[in-house]
Amino acid sequence: MRALVALLAVFCGCSPPPSYDKDDCPLYSELGPVRANPAGAMGRNLEAQFTFKVCPPETGVAEIRRKRIELKQALLKLMSAKTTDALEDPLRIEKLQREVHLLVNKEILKKTKVQEVYVTGFEVK
């Protein structure tokens, strides 16, 4: 009896592997530039562009397209909170990439996930 319970736990408790290869996940780059005024940086503007690798392939891009406005608002909020010191950090783009990746997967997307975030443009004016 214990063996049967153990087998059921093993087979029912594990989720199947994804039915897609993560390398085949499409890129979403239709968001356009996001412009913000950083915190305490009067007269300076930050403009960034992002591309997202979204999985699973069929539903990933559809969900991120549906949530485009929410995504842009969340990015604007994140970028507006950046300080002058943060904008001068040599690792600013890498940090922004990680922050955006977490933000999108935790707050925006519910049924799909961003696998990679690419910063395809970054300019402080």
PLM regions with names:
Residues 1-125:
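Flexible, low-complexity charged segments
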